[in-house]
Amino acid sequence: MQLNSTEISELIKQRIAQFNVVSEAHNEGTIVSVSDGVIRIHGLADCMQGEMISLPGNRYAIALNLERDSVGAVVMGPYADLAEGMKVKCTGRILEVPVGRGLLGRVVNTLGAPIDGKGPVEHDGFSPIEVIAPGVIDRQSVDQPVQTGYKSVDAMIPIGRGQRELIIGDRQTGKTAMAIDAIINQRDSGIKCVYVAIGQKASTIANVVRKLEEHGALSNTIVVVATASESAALQYLAPYAGCAMGEYFRDRGEDALIVYDDLSKQAVAYRQVSLLLRRPPGREAFPGDVFYLHSRLLERASRVNAEYVENFTKGAVKGKTGSLTALPIIETQAGDVSAFVPTNVISITDGQIFLETNLFNSGIRPAVNPGISVSRVGGAAQTKIIKKLSGGIRTALAQYRELAAFSQFASDLDEATRKQLSHGQKVTELLKQKQYAPMSVAQQGLVLFAAERGYLEDVELAKIGSFEAALLAYADRDHAPLMQEINQTGGYNDEIEGKLKSLLDSFKATQSW
């Protein structure tokens, strides 16, 4: 075979002409230390705060400490096989999670990856987990209710759309139960829900998911999970990921509800990350910015005006306001609400529901202490019928608690005092409610009307529960149009008052409880 020099030179020229030089600039660094999920990297001169750093094995770390000659980052996932000398790259991206309607009904981890075995998640795009909260001009006042389905909460501590209402109490006082019931009550309200589980047992979360499914609320809910076995970094970031998923609905003129269960564990995870990054500790060994940790998260829960929604959707949605309502949960130690994290979150939120161990153990469930529970903005959002009928409930309970304490020392009580004590006991009994049994506005209105207008006076204390059950069954069976009307309008006028009075009179005549 004879080589033709002309052909060879032509072939080389063609190859040179077709040769495509692709050059990529990578900001590359070297791992200099690995310990407890925290890595120190040398050489990442252009790294941003919060930037994702690409690690070997398709993993990422987040840059949290930018120092003069190194970067401190926390690994998102397993880190046992990382070693000194390994090369890492900057990505130029802040941590993002998938958002959209496809996430409803799914259980995902902090990074938005599905963990429920139902296949890949359908999403409408990605959103950064850290977003600046809407400004003052973009907000609208809270004036629409979020019904929790609990008589004691909706009557005395009402929650509005766009509000931040803290649920606080010791362990085993029913905090999660209250939040889950609030989610179950939204299944027909059109409010989308996000439940963020932080640092809990996997078995507990599985039980919550099963209960949501049983009550038909899972299809309306996104469950974001960072279990106790996951790294502190994932537990610290889980609430921000859940918030980004909830903001998707708020920014498109819809209403969403997010539950953070619980922020005490998030603060502990953040403390762990901060100490590993060698940040200086402060009170209770928490870092100096633990207030900002929660304030920047909870400020994102808001009600935004129609102009904000229109600008965000580029005119696709007009004349609609959006809201994200937050129910953060805080666990206290022996009822100490003056500890560091509880006082921080109390000062950030728009009110708190305080659950007490003593009330819970004495059978008063939900164990709400109406004396120190408050809603600072929810009153404007309360439905008309509940607002009108609930005024005397808080007063009756306050007077009852005062008299009950006094009556322990008094041997003989006058008739008026005995009557007040009896009424207070019956109202307390009436406000008891079983778990997974949220009540509609009409049912609450009817029960409050009975308490307010003295229909409980001749009912024995032991029969209050059966009286309520029989009354609600009677109303749903024989007065369905009235109940439907109240549920639709939430209104209260002389006509509705007259109908409720005749309903209760006819029910009392049956003596069927």
UniProtKB/Swiss-Prot annotation:
The keyword RNA-binding does not apply. GO terms for cellular component: plasma membrane; proton-transporting ATP synthase complex. InterPro entries: ATP_synth_asu-like_sf, ATP_synth_asu_C, ATP_synth_asu_C_sf, ATP_synth_F1_a_nt-bd_dom, ATP_synth_F1_asu, ATPase_a/bsu_AS, ATPase_F1/V1/A1_a/bsu_N, ATPase_F1/V1/A1_a/bsu_N_sf. This is ATP synthase subunit alpha. It is a peripheral membrane protein. It is found in: Cell inner membrane. The keyword NADP does not apply. Pfam families: ATP-synt_ab, ATP-synt_ab_C, ATP-synt_ab_N. PROSITE patterns: ATPASE_ALPHA_BETA. It catalyses: ATP + H2O + 4 H(+)(in) = ADP + phosphate + 5 H(+)(out). Produces ATP from ADP in the presence of a proton gradient across the membrane. The alpha chain is a regulatory subunit. GO terms for molecular function: ADP binding; ATP binding; proton-transporting ATP synthase activity, rotational mechanism. Its EC number is 7.1.2.2. F-type ATPases have 2 components, CF(1) - the catalytic core - and CF(0) - the membrane proton channel. CF(1) has five subunits: alpha(3), beta(3), gamma(1), delta(1), epsilon(1). CF(0) has three main subunits: a(1), b(2) and c(9-12). The alpha and beta chains form an alternating ring which encloses part of the gamma chain. CF(1) is attached to CF(0) by a central stalk formed by the gamma and epsilon chains, while a peripheral stalk is formed by the delta and b chains. The record marks 373 as: Required for activity. ATP binds at residues 169-176. Belongs to the ATPase alpha/beta chains family.
